[in-house]
Amino acid sequence: MRVLEEDLRNGYIRILVEDIDDLWILFMVLRKGDIVYARTSREVKPGEGGSSRRIPMVLGLRVEAIEFQEFTEKLRIRGIVVEGPEEFGVKGHYHTIAIGVGDQLAIVRETWSKHSLDILKKGVRRRRILLVSIDYDSACIAVLTEQGVKHHSEIQSDLPGKMYRVEHEEILDEYLSKVASALNNVIQQEEIDAVIIAGPGDLKNKLGENIRRDNRKHVYLDTTSTGGCQGISELLGRDVVKQVVGDLSIVKAKEVVEEFKRLIIKDPQLVAYGVDDVYGAVVYAAVSRIVVAGDLLHEPDDERRARVYEILEKAYETGAEVIIVPGKSDVGLEVQGFGGVIAVLRYRLFRGEHSP
């Protein structure tokens, strides 16, 4: 989750949803009476006798109900339209906005409780993604954080024409070496989680090889029409950024699963798995880290699904690290083998201490 704008004096917070975990945080934070603004579409009839058509628009809803849409990764927010385009006469009518990963929404509430703000703050993950856009003219280096994009530097190539072949190759090698050195410095200084290198030609591949060799970081390559800082702007609009954020959650989940598997053999009182066992642990505020397979959120049994929701709510309330992964991913399938949810505990719980 990224907080794009905050004005608590006027009760206003604007948020970017980065992964499914964020949808669950919003599910717990949103409440009846909130005003939510988001881009949506609505079927309207422009004039007398005309055929209706679906038109994109930004609407403000007074929230009446919030739910997860079955079998999709969307949060459905239903309410009465309080603000929207006057020409379509939508005010006062009911509407449902579906929020998914990559969407933005603004929430307006008269007074934000400390509890709600704490939950939102826990959802802001401190991810740092290094962005590089390179071509034969220049390379731009920037870091994407929750606060936005911070530009570090732009390096010019100063390449001579290709008619000076030997000199061209030497200066090209120096250029790549200079960019790689600058990247390695930023990686060390900024505690980077992943690197995205983009550009129109083959230079991104050569640079990517250098960075992979020098660092144990996840390096992603993508194609943009230009390099330099203009290429960074183009890169931010591409799906690869969303993919990287999702992959980082998978990497974190794998770390928790490996720790869980190690502890279940060496110290089984420090883990819990399965809905009932994890629920018992979370009630005691014993859960430190928890991984949930996404399929469990769509459990057809109402009572069992409600128990899963309780686990998530109590985990967030007690400061546990919560990671939700796709059920069909490798790590998701592994978690499903343990009942769909696993937890690493803060302290030992002997099974007689809590009833399933």
UniProtKB/Swiss-Prot annotation:
Q: Which UniProt keywords apply?
A: Cytoplasm, Endonuclease, Hydrolase, Metal-binding, Nuclease
Q: Where in the cell is it found?
A: Cytoplasm
Q: What Pfam family is a match for this entry?
A: eRF1_1
The coenzyme or cofactor needed here is:
a divalent metal cation
The yes or no answer to whether the keyword Manganese is present is no
> Which Gene Ontology BP terms does the record give?
nonfunctional rRNA decay; nuclear-transcribed mRNA catabolic process, no-go decay; nuclear-transcribed mRNA catabolic process, non-stop decay; ribosome disassembly; RNA surveillance
According to the UniProt record, what class of enzyme is this?
A: hydrolase
Molecular function (GO) terms listed? Answer: endonuclease activity; metal ion binding
- Record-listed E.C. numbers: 3.1.-.-
* This protein's record includes keyword Metal-binding: yes
Task: Please provide one cellular component term from the Gene Ontology annotations of this protein.
Answer: cytoplasm
PANTHER family reported for this sequence: PELOTA, PROTEIN PELOTA HOMOLOG
Question: What family name appears in the similarity comment?
Answer: Belongs to the eukaryotic release factor 1 family. Pelota subfamily.
As for what it does, the entry says: May function in recognizing stalled ribosomes, interact with stem-loop structures in stalled mRNA molecules, and effect endonucleolytic cleavage of the mRNA. May play a role in the release non-functional ribosomes and degradation of damaged mRNAs. Has endoribonuclease activity.
Q: Matching HAMAP family, A to Z?
A: PelO (MF_01853)
Complex and partners: Monomer.
The free-text domain note is: The N-terminal domain has the RNA-binding Sm fold. It harbors the endoribonuclease activity.
Protein name, please? Answer: Protein pelota homolog
- In the UniProt record, what gene is named as encoding this protein? pelA
